[in-house]
Amino acid sequence: MKRNHPTNNSPATVNKTMNRRTCLATLAATAISRTLGAGTTPPPKAQIAITLDLEMSRNFPTRDSTHWDYEKGNLNEETKRYSVEAAKIVKQSGGRIHFFAVGRVFEQPDITWLKSIVEDGHPVGNHTYDHINLTAGKVEDLQFRFQRAPWLLRGQPLHDAIRENIQITNAAMKNRLGIKPAGFRTPGGFANGLRDHAAPRGILKELGFDWISSLYPAHPYTMPKQKPDAKVVDGIVAALAKAQPFRYPDGMLEIPMSPISDIGAFRTGQWNLEWYLDTLKACLEKTIDQGLVFDFLAHPSCLYVVDPEFKAIRLICELATRHASKAKLTDLNQIAAMS
């Protein structure tokens, strides 16, 4: 009986050959993919926080408004309304604003507006009681108010005065809002953060803070009322690299503020709104493209004057929503938890 031996063209041989070719092609494609993919891992999702400092700002609503230096917490009605509306806008986009309040805000008789913000889920952090300078070298340089009324310090040494100013803000928040502060932001931003100021960091750790926001990176500015050219904008965007979270040697986490702040743009630069929005957009696009952390720093007491239609905040929400696969709105507590 003649047996049928498979020939080179038989189905069995063809299938074996095709299986071998398919396997080799798959292995080759995988190797090529790995080779091409080396070093091109997609960046992490960008984390975009909107932070608003609740204080009054020198030079707003008018350039000659300087009395706020002595009453930083005496918020006017416009500032309160802007804060409430901004919180609603961001919540509608699925985000939260991280507020930082100076303690003197809690001396005002009616803070129902701030309670409503807290009840809507927006965190509020400690911004010291009197908007003091934590890097001051002597006690009289802590704040304008103490230069005018030094007896308020009761002869305290520098670091005791700093500790008390932070501590009584914690107490005020507990008493008036029933909450603990959601982190700490220094009044003013420093190009080196608190790297050279271990004592204030130690005070903050002692008071229970495990993250702070104190660094604002150096970047180019324009002359007053001068439109920022491409070189200035590129310099501001480049400064984002210096505004990423890091830890100090003592373990304290720093979450820097991102450029450009509203005070830098509108007080120092005296920019118009469109220049500011264009620069903000460039910073956000870089943040989203590279998966960076972005901490939008602004003050309702400034924004209600220069941006009454909330264009900056709406721009942030719009870009985060449009690029939802690459970016998300968040707050500094969540950034800290992921750092």
Descriptions of predicted regions:
Residues 43-123, 131-133, 180, 185-190, ...:
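Active-site beta->alpha N-cap acidic-glycine motif
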Residues 84-96, 147-192, 209, 255, ...:
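CE4/NodB-like, metal-dependent polysaccharide N-deacetylase domain
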